[in-house]
Amino acid sequence: MENKKFIRIRGAAENNLKHIDLDIPRDELVVLTGLSGSGKSSLAFDTIYAEGQRRYMESLSSYARQFLGQMEKPNVESIEGLPPTISIDQKSTNRNPRSTVGTVTEIYDYFRLLYARIGVPHCPVCGRKISRQTVDQMVDSLMALKERTKILLLAPVVRGKKGRHEKVLEQARKSGYVRVRIDGSQYDLEEEITLDKNIKHNIEIVVDRLVIKEGIEKRLADSLENVLKLADGLAFVEVVDGTPMTFSQNFSCPDCGISIDEIEPRSFSFNNPFGACPTCFGLGYKMEFDEQLMIPDQSLSIDQGAIIVPGWQSCTDEGSFTRAILNALAEEFHFTLDVPFESYSKEIHDILINGTNKSVKVRYKGQRGEGVYDIVFEGLIKNVERRYRETGSETIKAEYETFMRITPCSTCKGMRLKRESLAVTVADKNIYEVTNLSIRDLASFLSNLTLTTTQQLIGEQILKEIRARVQFLIDVGLDYLCLSRATGTLSGGEAQRIRLATQIGSGLVGVAYILDEPSIGLHQRDNDKLLGTLKHLRDLGNSVIVVEHDEDTMRAADYVVDIGPGAGEHGGQVVAAGTAEELMKNPASITGKYLSGELKIPVPNIRREPQGWLTVVGAKENNLKNITVKFPKGVFTCVTGVSGSGKSSLVNSILYQALAKQLNRARTIPGAYKEIKGIEQFDKVINIDQSPIGRTPRSNPATYTGVFDMIRDLFASTVDAKTRGYNKGRFSFNVKGGRCEACSGDGIVKIEMHFLPDVYVPCEVCKGKRYNRETLEVKYKGKSIYDVLNMTVEEALTFFENVPSIYRKIETLYQVGLSYIRLGQPSTTLSGGEAQRIKLATELSRKSTGKTIYILDEPTTGLHFADVHKLTEMLQKLVENGNTVIVIEHNLDVIKTADYIIDMGPEGGDGGGTVVAQGTPEEVAECPQSYTGYYVKRVIAHDI
């Protein structure tokens, strides 16, 4: 019975774990905390989750297992009392452009079903409501007319078509019909009827004339069947002294003659040809070449190199073919190539960009001699599109793609579905309009939905499921998102909370959920909602194990495990375990000391004064409400606000992109704004984000920071290397010479397993050391180049203490809290937070101009209190060098140390997009409208 109450872990030694023994209570909310790199993830994901998954796999048949691949057994002696495990981490976010919030949560699937079952179809051309009726329903509608009403049953055989239509009239005559109505006038079929073939005609055969009275149902039904047969399921009824009526057996518009297919759930799927827009295939957008990117500085002339797109950069050279084309165009259309591009008339501009139908004579002198060619110029955009299509090189394709931008599909306007599907409505909204509402507005729409009795009966169960799932998203603080939002644009925290909401919807019991920092990107105000969700999962009867640094989560947990005491080699032990109160009393726990207030990140005594201002005027990207925002120069600024308030739109989409375009000459298109004043005060902008420092295992901290070049120089200067004639290139694992050729310097060899995942094994020749034997024989202070790459930052610091240039570079890695990572650690194994701090360290090691503006988005992701302390010191150091630092952040320990706060809000989504408060933390704390101010006031008061 005891095994059921605890997950008993014995001898866990995965990665840096030091054979730890730990009992984690079952069916409780447990937080694993500790310094970055201390071993939390190794315990939670690489041990508990991996073993749970492996045991599940073992329970499957060998046939099923061959499709799933084998899972390594974690390095642990035993785990008892382990329930099935489900991991909700940040890395498994789906970046597929077809994946949306709606598809991930499965709410969209329910909406597809709802629209297929109770949706009202309309004509996609004229918008008229169209319905399908059986003959019985048509008879009932007509019998409901006033008794003695005279009616004519008409079969519309020709609708709006030119011609004499002799065959149609002849066929009607042969079938025994007597009268016909042409363009509103009745004719006898026995008389000679001649129609003008150049005019569009409407022809309806008069099938029957009736008076509504009891007992004519049978005749009415028979006549209607004849009408429907003649007119492909359509019937017109002329009511004498009344309104004409139209009936359709199919979904077709009587006015436009457009029919729509049977409405099914797949009709609303943008991942299915039956529902997807035929132009963009359901993506909602297209990649198109953009003039602004191809000719970024239109104040330059063509002679000065205004056109920078590949294939046309040579047009400044008089001997090139592209120049010959432009010379011919200039001669034909009377313009010159030495004036600013922006000064061309609309006509000339259009010829250059979109081409001309007129043939021009191009004189070109090439290697084969001189010739004159008649060419119809297709325009820069079409020419580059053709080059892009025809090239076989992936590298050149990638280069071309930097000149393209994503634009909404011209057919569906970004709605992803074909027009027939978008013409189906529920409560006057089509499926795109509903999924484009914020979750908050969607909940309101669903609660106020008025349906007919039939619709209510059919849709009741579907709506119940939709409402429940929408509420789960609100409960995890995502009410500002919409279902149509692509998952690739979500932050790690948002994606994780969506998956959390989906899990609650599944209602599983007796499972161990393992989460990785679900509070990322969440404002303090919404933290309670998240904690409520985690507790709800626990109360259902699940074990919830959370890797977390958030103070509120630790205090709310039933049990906290502090892993440490340090990071990397110095971590991997259980320092303390118990409730938050018990941790506070434990002198060995650094976490406990921060929780109790014994250790704290100090509030600066003085706030720096701005040295100038950078002003963004008329920002209106996404939900920004045409606002003007002033960013102070030479200080540390925090941009705060609830999730979805517009922080990223302002800082990343507008400010960074605009500065990168002007200062760094980057090919970017900023978000919508009017102007930015004060750019001349800066010389460059650097975005220190959490994207990987490299996409391949060949990239590592040593190569990224540039210290590897210095280390290779050092090895090349040794007596051994000089004797053998080795230069620094010998010590690179990227080029032939010094690397192991069996694995091309990778240290691992990929074995393709066809329908199983590829298997990577250490190279048998170099044993994973990446270099050949001769290179490894060259030693510096008794260590080979491989040994140096295998050192942790801390070890390297001691090893290179007498080499100042190398020491300085490595010291900054140590200062940002990365003492535990190895110099040669593949970039693919680094977390987002670690990658960001490597970039920060690289910037700190550079000589400062004092005119740089640094932008960071949530740099505290994955950081413990002690690491946040180090981070704030690093950011302050950047500012002390005269630079400007702008940080998007929710962490109060960072916010309270800022010189200036810009608080966005007041709410997320449509309720945001304005500046609620700005000023020093003390000034913002006094603003009653600011949610951030309320929490800043509390934290400052607590620290004084």
At which residue positions do the language-model features occur?
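Conserved phosphate-binding elements of NTP-dependent enzyme cores
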Residues: 1-944
